[in-house]
């Protein structure tokens, strides 16, 4: 696990940030970005986070230890290499794995600090929208689906955490609620969706920005959603 030191960081996006994203990625509307605002300071205690997403090998050990049969969704050679991220599991099963491992799911703020550091950068590696630094859709890289954790050396955060942009969206602990002082109404806020972060092999580089707030129903099983765990320092 990687230590994330205590202290403040910049979470979310400013109006300037979302206007940059909308222009750069040719978005038709700023409405897609409004839930990222405002840019605000959050202070967190120190914590530790998994260096890479939980793997199929890790998850298989959990299933064996708890007497669970192999999941039917994992009988797919495109996604079940031992070192690929485990995918196609609901939020509760991800949370249960973390508890079994004496860890927990990250909060949205913890995940975002681990990805962006303290300077409000757009991507783990900085502000440059370089599609070669992440496993995303449509750039013709060697990964058609998920990649084994840590195999793209450029995809590293200021703290040394890997694969926080692209590869798999990652479950967080939080419900999809507005950021403090967010000024925009959204009918999807509430206790219906869980926040997912990071983008995936099946999404574009815009959605791999650290401030992006993906959302998924807790019961959904998607081959582009995985997770990692955190623990107290």
Where are the regions that the model predicts?
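Short, surface-exposed beta-strand/loop micro-motifs that present aromatic residues
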Residues: 40-41, 50, 158-160, 218
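Functional-site microenvironments in short loops/helix caps that host divalent-cation chemistry
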Residues: 10, 15-31, 69, 74-214, ...
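Short, compositionally biased
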Residues: 1-67, 91-92, 128, 213, ...
